[in-house]
Amino acid sequence: MEAEFSGRYLLTLAAMTVAGFILITGVVAIVNPFGLIRFAPTIPGINTAKVARNESDRLIKRYDPITLRPKTIIIGTSRVKFAFDPAKVGSVFAPAYNAGIDALSISEGQQLLEGYLHDGIPIEHVFFELFLFQFFHSWPGRQQEAPHGRDGAITDFLATSFSGSAVRAAIETVRASLASNVVVTRENGFRPIARPHNGVGFVPPQWLASAKTQSEPSSDDEISSPKQPLSLLRDESFRDLEKIVEFCRAHNIDLRFFVSPLHPVFAHTQGKVLLHEWLRRISVLPRVISFLTTEQFRDYELTRPKLYYSDYSHVSFAAADLMIEDLMAYPNQRYGHVLNPNTLPRIIAEWDDQLSAWEQLNPDFVQGFKAAMRSGK
């Protein structure tokens, strides 16, 4: 009798466990908080605002393109993620996917691209962003790099369907969907929040924290460039770029690099020598379009609204639209300039002139930076 009761108890416990597993998995599948289940229904007020996608790019953007099957991939940092609308990519380049990820390193971009081809995505064109901070040994906000591949697919499935984090994500999705005013990452990888800045509080106090480790004052009138710029740039990043070039060449992929606008706040605090060395090293890459000296992007004074910048780090939708237009039109671009060893001296000279003009427009910022460097704060 006791054995029979024990058997029934274990059977009931097993049935409840299975039922609980099915219930949790079913609820998570219906809510679909990560947006990975393409056939899941869209229910207003329940699963329209998938906020979990916003913070899960390194997972989600491995798998999204498998079902979307884009012809063009835009790879880059949060500057791409927030501003580059794949819907603006047309003609032979459509459809496109925004593979922008916060603080994306060059090696992560390489792994993403190789993983996409491994998964059979029919990529024909790649627009690859080159941002100065991607080449530093350390970058605030950079996460541990996670290789792309099929080896972790089962683990990823469990993490997004049957786990505590998946349940929490489902609850957050329902809560945000009820509010219906949350900006979320779309299925094509685009999270549209890079609006023009209104000029108020444009440069946050935190700029000093990252700036003081890159430059030191040499006198009251001059901020010196880093003494050893090469030590600040990761050689591995440049080697990874060479691998990307060879990979795309081997698979007949049209690869186009682009250097998006760099706000003078960054340029001034990093120093000209470092910037020159970085430009020199990327100028040997094929098909590099530089937007550093584009006249339209000089709308960066600290004292008035910014059409082409959403903050001191990110560009706006308007800037991204112009860059997309040029990337598709290459080599007949209207706004950017081809960067190669022949054009390098001219681009550097123009950029230095622009930076000097900006410093004259913003003397308070320049003097404040010098004072901060002298005090070591």
Task: Please tell me what each predicted stretch does.
Residues 47-74:
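Short extracytoplasmic
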Residues 12-32:
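Hydrophobic membrane-insertion alpha-helices, especially the h-region
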Residues 269-377:
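C-terminal regions of proteins
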Residues 68-161:
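Membrane-embedded segments
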Residues 130, 139, 143-251, 335, ...:
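Secreted/periplasmic serine-hydrolase-like ester/acetyl group-modifying domain
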Residues 31-56:
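Alpha-helical transmembrane signal-anchor/signal-peptide segments
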Residues 1-9:
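N-terminal Lys/Arg-rich, disordered targeting/topogenic segments
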Residues 213-304:
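Flexible, glycine-rich surface segments
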